[in-house]
Amino acid sequence: MAQEQGHFQLLRADAIRSKLIDTFSLIEHLQGLSQAVPRHTLREILDPSYQQKLMSGDQEQLVRFSIKPRRMGHITHSRRLLSRLRVRCSRMPPLSLWAGWVLDSSVFSKFIISLIFLNTFVLMVEIELMESTNTALWPVKLALEVADWFILLSFIVEILLMWLASFSLFWKDAWNVFDFFVTLLSLLPELVVLLGVPAHSVWLQLLRVCRVLRSLKLFARFRQIKVILLALVRALKSMTFLLMLLLIFFYIFAVTGVYFFREYSRSTIEGLEYNMFFSDLLNSLVTVFILFTLDHWYAVLQDIWKVPESSRVFSSIYVILWLLLGSIIFRNIIVAMMVTNFQNIRSELSEEMSHLEVQYKADMFKQQIIQRRQHSESLRGTSLGKVSEDIIETSDASDDDDDDDDDDDDDDDDDDDKSDATESDNEESDSENSESENSESEKIDPEKDYAKKSYPEKSHPEKSYPEKSHPEKSYPEKSHPKKSYDEQAEAEKVKEESKEKAYPVSHSISSHGSTAADTAFLENLDWETLVHENLPGLMDMDQDDRIVWPRDSLFRYFELLEKLQYNLEERKKLQEFAVQALMSFEDK
């Protein structure tokens, strides 16, 4: 086909050709197995009413299964471990599966969070009772020590469970690594005491302070705190070069202050309060940071002016220039970048939340559609059951009336035969015409009585008895060479009225099916109006139901679709040629 369309190849046409080959190879494979193509869906098999019909009529047909993947929001490691073949085939579940189940449970998470808050309270009480020598408080101190050890052991057990669940995944998570180092720093002072180090050692006191870091474990427990910390880290990453430039200016102004304020730092004048601020590089860096925060800048400047050896002009230029660069320019830039980063993160989070909200609304809407369809099917089933009962009742009643009508029709036929035998002249023919009209009126009256008897209040679509009622029976051959056209038209009109009375249109048709009038009305509608009227019904339809095309139609569809791609490509080239021709025409 590519050679027929041209010597060029199209990716879309090749994709359609491959789809055609794959589809027909699958069909041939299915035909080789069962000599049939799947014509039924899983929903039809699960429907009890339709299933009974299929099992009684065609039991060898294939069923098309539509598999719906269950998308979960968060797949835990324990769930992944449970789906592994080695775990599913093992006789006993592994300990890692049990550890993951414990870590994922909400009870264990709430227990760890309560221990973190309890640790904060215990440390607060220990600090208050540290210097107390009251012997009555020894039981309280012992209880606090036991609580401290219990909290520490609980944190260690949590880390061991994480290692047991997945040792490699533990070190890949930054929050788990942070939690591990916080627990290790709080464990070190207890280990040092067990090794025999004096309790009044300076290093031991510093390590005991690390127990306060256990409160930082809350960062890894609450999602909102994680978002704030991640926003800060992201903002600092974007301000890396700005902070480097700010540190360079810090260093320049600190070195300049040490060099130019030597006389002020070495002055022996009494009453100087800040003469040590520029004594060395570290003090100068601290002083520059103080000026950066606009703290005591005017008091420092006035204290420098007290020394005659220091230049007032240079000291004023130094302080004002640093205030302009550091306090006004750099600080405002840092604040602006922080606000911008937080706004970007907030917009991303709001977009994600809106997406989740839309997904939730879509799921709820789909669930409502399913419930509505199930409710409508249940109502339709009950209504059809009532209609079937009414049809059975009316059919029994109509059979009795049909027997009476047949007897009347036989008597009428005998009368007609006798009248035909006695016809001799025009007068007799006129009298025969009048008798035939009377006989027709007598035939119509039983039909009216039959309609009243068989359908007193209820009517049922698609149920008629043309063989028994004989509404079209008029015997034109026997009569009536002189019967006028007006009389025939009047007789046909009476017949139509009798039909309408015998078979009235039911209200149940509009609720359970489509009538001929509705069909004619829909045919006159335009496409857009038809789509808008049937859109609720289309939305209620199950999207998983598939229509199986015939083999020749499917092949023709793919063939035409492939030709369409080549036609579109030729149309595109012709448009390009036309554009070039118009451009050359304008140039000339």
UniProtKB/Swiss-Prot annotation:
Result of knocking out the encoding gene: Mice are normal but males are sterile. Male sterility is due to defects in sperm motility unability to fertilize intact eggs. In mice lacking Catsper1, the sperm lacks CatSper2, while in mice lacking CatSper1, the sperm lacks CatSper1, suggesting that stable expression of CatSper1 requires CatSper2 and vice versa.
Enumerate the Extracellular topological stretches: 130-138, 199-201, 261-279, 293-312
Protein topology in the membrane:
Multi-pass membrane protein
Q: How is its activity regulated?
A: In contrast to the human ortholog, not activated by progesterone. Activated by intracellular alkalinization.
Q: Which InterPro entries match?
A: CatSper2 (IPR028747), Ion_trans_dom (IPR005821), Volt_channel_dom_sf (IPR027359)
The family this protein is said to belong to = Belongs to the cation channel sperm-associated (TC 1.A.1.19) family.
Name the UniProt record assigns to this protein: Cation channel sperm-associated protein 2
Q: Which organism is it from?
A: Mus musculus
